[in-house]
From Swiss-Prot:
HAMAP family: IPP_trans. The keyword Cytoplasm does not apply. This is tRNA dimethylallyltransferase. GO terms for biological process: tRNA modification. Its cofactor is Mg(2+). ATP binds at G12, P13, T14, A15, A16, G17, K18, T19. NCBIfam families: miaA. Keywords: ATP-binding, Magnesium, Nucleotide-binding, Transferase, tRNA processing. It catalyses: adenosine(37) in tRNA + dimethylallyl diphosphate = N(6)-dimethylallyladenosine(37) in tRNA + diphosphate. Substrate binds at T14, A15, A16, G17, K18, T19.
Amino acid sequence: MSGKPPAIFLMGPTAAGKTDLAIELTKVLPCELISVDSALVYRGMDIGTAKPSKEILAAHPHRLIDILDPVESYSAKQFCTDALDAMAEITARGKIPLLVGGTMLYYKALVEGLADMPPADAAVRAELEAQASALGLGELHRQLAEVDPESAARIHPNDPQRLIRALEVYRVSGESMTAHRQRQFAESRGADAGANGHLPYTVASLAIAPTDRHILHQRIALRFSQMLEQGFVDEVRSLRARSDLHAGLPSIRAVGYRQVWDYLDGHLTENEMQERGIIATRQLAKRQFTWLRGWDGVHWLDSLACDNLSRTLKYLGAVSILS
């Protein structure tokens, strides 16, 4: 192993079994867990995020869970700051940071760094949101393809948050998001370790998912149904009762939450809400797979295998993470 301390990434699509495997690893390795999930950061959003139970979190603490109120925003840049701080603390105690979750942008930002993008502009964002409502997301994707074809190729036409942000960057700065990132990458080469994406760790990257995509779809549908049985609608109803929360916030736009919110607003029937929630979760999983297919050096595990712990330990030994 190089002189860098070790770290483990445990990635994968939603409903693949990442948390269960991570907890098993903490029982046999000197690891501490860091959540890599843009929804788990929010307090009071437990059922719809499939957040580990209070009992599990007490026995197996996860950093970066329940750190924000749902009215607040959380960026990939802030995640990098928080995650690097947590990793440094864990390493200083002689333990291994084990990062687990499915927000692939956060992993990418941690490894490659983020370009310094212009700040959000409320007026521009409101104009783009109005266009999306009036003309549809397809029109926004068409506009993005004209000014930033590289970003348009990366961003799904049904991903409003990223579409709007990419167009916002262009309108505010006059430069595409791709141009910002390319300049940042050029400037970061040769930078000090830990800055601008030169992660000062030797990372073992693992991903877990069923080898049969149909099985993952079944797991997604089952989990969404279980969430509803556990009181997901009441959870969103409690959030909706707050005067400071609305459907445009990143927390409420999280998969599942926006569909239940629309149901409570009377825009969807109960069956439509459940169907759209499952579809949205499947689309999220598809995007996660897309990210993972381009991830260098990832070691895949089958969610249904009974020996994933031993396979993981064997792999970590082979790449000298445990030496």
